[in-house]
């Protein structure tokens, strides 16, 4: 009877991640585990099939061979004698030979337990939080060391035993014609040990899915794109190997008033026509509260004022940026009759004196006049 496709056995697609494969395995292993189905031969057969599929699809070398050659690529009985072992074995042999030559293959000896994967957490902050700094409580979904077996993967009271196929070496020698090469042991996958009685909680993986809460200090001055590394706070490693790291990726939300550029802040401040013409003091918002800003008489709209030290403290030095305020003159609206009359009277006083009171406007209209004269000449 031909074997079922390993991906079909676990109910996953060929592009599924290793983490999803592990989740599918754990779900099915719990369903068909012999301890839960005593005396059920069908469940026992299903469990063995699931375990075999899992062992192949979570081993990078075996998975690659299976994806290319199917079951023939991972059948240890097809490795003996001559070139009659089939295309799958021939390809695997040359893959290992050239992998060793160019540094891609494993050296002899047991496979080292893999370091835990790094994790990334996207943290969104307000501008105020980013500028002042704070401590955040982050809830991180991860793989943690199984507390029942303490990461060994073996059932409580038992331990891993020496592999009978490779006798603890983690490697087996295979011959193909004139070639003799070492490959990871297909039984223990290079570990040199096998777990006969897997832990009932982690099912032999040594790790379980878990969420943990971390208190993370965010330094003052961080900005979008900054990354904070927390060593050892990633996923737990395999069978006691070091854990990965956690990287907190910072992004800062847009602010209703301020725009940040490096350590400087920018904002627009509206002023009245009379304030721009006569001058005076206005209140300007900063991240530390309101401050007074003196507006000189005859200030034009768009003029920039710099408030030194009112920007952002650099996260990498003691430098502090500035706050740059651009004043924008507002045209008055909803005028009553008296206000309109006063503006007409004011406008009348400017007749014949536009160069004196509006030099930029007069210069602009002189330029327009000259442009049309040159055009018609």
Swiss-Prot record:
Binds 2 Zn(2+) ions per monomer. Residues 5-70 form the J domain. GO terms for cellular component: cytoplasm. Zn(2+) 2 binds at residues 163, 166, 185, 188. GO terms for molecular function: ATP binding; heat shock protein binding; unfolded protein binding; zinc ion binding. The J domain is necessary and sufficient to stimulate DnaK ATPase activity. Zinc center 1 plays an important role in the autonomous, DnaK-independent chaperone activity of DnaJ. Zinc center 2 is essential for interaction with DnaK and for DnaJ activity. This is Chaperone protein DnaJ. It comes from Shewanella baltica (strain OS155 / ATCC BAA-1091).
């Amino acid at each position: 009877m031909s074997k079922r496709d390993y991906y079909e056995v676990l109910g996953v697609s060929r592009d599924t991640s290793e983490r999803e494969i592990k989740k599918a395995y754990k779900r099915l292993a719990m369903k068909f585990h012999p301890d839960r189905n005593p005396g059920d031969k069908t469940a026992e057969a299903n469990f063995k099939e699931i375990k075999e599929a899992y062992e192949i699809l979570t081993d990078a070398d075996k998975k690659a061979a299976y994806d290319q050659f199917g079951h023939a690529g991972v059948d240890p009985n097809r490795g003996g004698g001559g070139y009659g072992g089939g295309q799958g074995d021939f390809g695997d042999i040359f893959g290992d030979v050239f992998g060793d030559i160019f540094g891609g293959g494993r050296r002899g000896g047991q496979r080292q337990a893999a370091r835990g994967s790094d994790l990334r957490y996207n943290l969104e902050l307000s501008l105020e939080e980013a500028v002042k700094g704070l401590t955040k409580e982050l809830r991180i979904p991860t793989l943690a060391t199984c507390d029942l077996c303490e990461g060994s993967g073996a059932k409580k009271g038992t331990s891993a035993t020496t592999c009978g196929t490779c006798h603890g070496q983690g490697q087996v020698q295979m011959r193909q014609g004139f070639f003799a090469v070492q490959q990871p042991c297909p039984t223990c996958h290079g570990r040199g040990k096998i777990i006969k009685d897997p832990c009932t909680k982690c099912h032999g993986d040594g790790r379980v899915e878990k969420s943990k809460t971390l208190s993370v200090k965010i330094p003052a001055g961080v900005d979008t794109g900054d990354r904070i590394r927390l060593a050892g706070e990633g996923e737990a490693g395999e069978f006691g190997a070091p854990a990965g790291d956690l990287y907190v990726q910072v992004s800062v939300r847009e602010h209703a008033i301020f725009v940040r550029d490096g350590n400087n802040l920018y904002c627009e401040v509206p002023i009245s026509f009379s304030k721009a013409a006569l001058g005076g003091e206005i209140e300007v918002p900063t991240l530390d509260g309101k401050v007074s800003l003196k507006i000189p008489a005859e200030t034009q709209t768009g003029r920039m004022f710099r408030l030194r030290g009112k920007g952002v403290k650099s996260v990498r030095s003691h430098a502090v940026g500035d706050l740059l305020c651009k004043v924008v003159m507002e045209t008055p609206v909803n005028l009553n009759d008296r206000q309109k009359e006063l503006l007409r009277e004011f406008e009348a006083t400017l007749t014949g004196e536009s160069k004196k009171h509006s030099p930029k406007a007069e210069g602009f209209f002189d330029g327009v006049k000259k442009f049309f004269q040159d055009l018609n000449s």
